[in-house]
Amino acid sequence: MVVFSKTAALVLGLSTAVSAAPAPTRKGFTINQIARPANKTRTVNLPGLYARSLAKFGGTVPQSVKEAASKGSAVTTPQNNDEEYLTPVTVGKSTLHLDFDTGSADLWVFSDELPSSEQTGHDLYTPSSSATKLSGYSWDISYGDGSSASGDVYRDTVTVGGVTTNKQAVEAASKISSEFVQDTANDGLLGLAFSSINTVQPKAQTTFFDTVKSQLDSPLFAVQLKHDAPGVYDFGYIDDSKYTGSITYTDADSSQGYWGFSTDGYSIGDGSSSSSGFSAIADTGTTLILLDDEIVSAYYEQVSGAQESYEAGGYVFSCSTDLPDFTVVIGDYKAVVPGKYINYAPVSTGSSTCYGGIQSNSGLGLSILGDVFLKSQYVVFNSEGPKLGFAAQA
């Protein structure tokens, strides 16, 4: 573990800026997420989200979760519960609102190649006059909740914040499932995992970050997701106004294409820390925290009335319950997730029973630290090493 203080980070940032000065195209930039309108309602399939997260990493989806997802257990909700964080991106001639996902490596979008019935409510990608279709290339993604998308591949111009590339692989959807069509706030996904897991065939393509990182002052991006508010992505630099204390760094394991790392333990509420560390993935594209069964059971033993519900497809409890904090130990740093973040959402409209933000990883062998965890942290994803940095949000 390496701990960088704000002062050290500033000195490193200054030295980087000096060494980069001869190359005027190198830069750093911030891109803000967009909040959904407060009066916009939509349907969220909670067990479907859970199933998709498990399947994304090759996990087994329990039968109870499959059945709950197929029944469409849902809550109609405005922009709360932080199910997705959307960011404006210019793709070709279109500005789209995309889900930035550190757990995948594809940039796929709704396009004008979709049937008209699947286009309604979405902003669409239209290839620019300079776009090149990659003949014989295709992509096809399926998730555990039954959702899927597939289509063609183009080489086109993509702009995020202050950085543009005219040679980014853009995966244009020509077929898409109803689960995605119904989410009219979301026009696609921008993957920020390692390019080794890009799904384009016959040859994998590079992520946007890998394509543009040579233009940045430093080959990194930092994430500040927020609770009940839009968050921020910083590319190429670390903003010391967004965190308190020091950034604790740990080696990232990219062997499976994800931003993986090893923790050094955990604690629940005011209890003492367990020294049993676990392997984890930092994933902005997963909503929940998915942990080993023994940790999940230990957590909900501290929640009055909590139970694992077959019907709901996960742990539930009374919405009025005060939940204990959950802390992940990384070196000498303790990343605290407030209990209120773990009270994720009612299991259905008007219900007094809520769905937990911590659920089982179903024997996956890896824990997934999704948005419920990340929105309490300022997290640095540095491709040099690679390494991950964690600090409490300011």
Swiss-Prot record:
Localization in the cell? Secreted
One Gene Ontology term from the biological process aspect of the record: proteolysis
Give the source's domain of life in one word.
Eukaryota
What EC number(s) are associated with this protein in UniProt?
A: 3.4.23.18
**Disulfide bridge positions per record:** 319-354
Q: Which GO terms describe its cellular component?
A: extracellular region
Q: Which residues form the Peptidase A1 domain?
A: 85-391
**Family membership noted in the UniProt record:** Belongs to the peptidase A1 family.
Q: Give the function comment from the record.
A: Secreted aspartic endopeptidase that allows assimilation of proteinaceous substrates. The scissile peptide bond is attacked by a nucleophilic water molecule activated by two aspartic residues in the active site. Shows a broad primary substrate specificity. Favors hydrophobic residues at the P1 and P1' positions, but also accepts a lysine residue in the P1 position, leading to the activation of trypsinogen and chymotrypsinogen A.
PANTHER family from the UniProt entry: ASPERGILLOPEPSIN-1-RELATED (PTHR47966:SF2), BETA-SITE APP-CLEAVING ENZYME, ISOFORM A-RELATED (PTHR47966)
Its recorded name reads Aspergillopepsin-1
- Source species of the chain: Aspergillus phoenicis
